[in-house]
Amino acid sequence: KVTIIGCGEVGRASIHQSIQIGASVTAIDVNENTLEDLKNKYGENISTIISGTDEAVNAIRSADLVIGAVLLPGRKPPVVVTEEDISAMEQGTVIVDVAIDQGGCVEGVKPNTHSDPFEIRNGVIVSAIANLPGAVPRTSSIELSTNLQKYVDNLLIENWFDKYKNNESLRPSLQIHNGLLLSEEVADSLSLTLSKLV
């Protein structure tokens, strides 16, 4: 039984792979539309649960594998797997906290490394490998470069600042400019002063 918490890019990839190997998959997310899309795509191969419910807690505690893939861009993710959850799990259960680079979504989690990939807590294996894509540096570098290209192209034009300032989709990617912090999420999570673009 695989329970995946957070159904963004990583969560969806985990769901797909888990279904491909025949696992019983439960997806947990805060967004009902996301869960409905998954149910429409995978049908009876997936159970979907809204986050924060007793049903979600039960799915986490009864899983053989829990993947925490919670992402709130620019913010520390909420704790979605508690110490109490870990204590209630069967020994040998595996938890993978993919959100560790943003602070982790498992209570008390500490970053692991590729050479020391997990810790055991109450008989539960908890893996929170920081910079997980670093295991395949060439592939991850190519993917990152491909995804960054549109931003770099926009920086190379003469009036790049106006382009960012006036473009809804580009504006959030400009987080610091001339020493001013422009990201509300980063300002909140670090208790810093937020500035506005003028």
Predicted regions and their residues:
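Short glycine- and Lys/Arg-enriched binding-loop motifs that mark or flank ligand-binding interfaces
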Residues: 2-7, 99-100, 175
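General structural feature for long, well-ordered alpha-helical segments within catalytic domains
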Residues: 6, 10, 14, 34, ...
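Rossmann-like adenosine-cofactor binding region
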Residues: 40-123
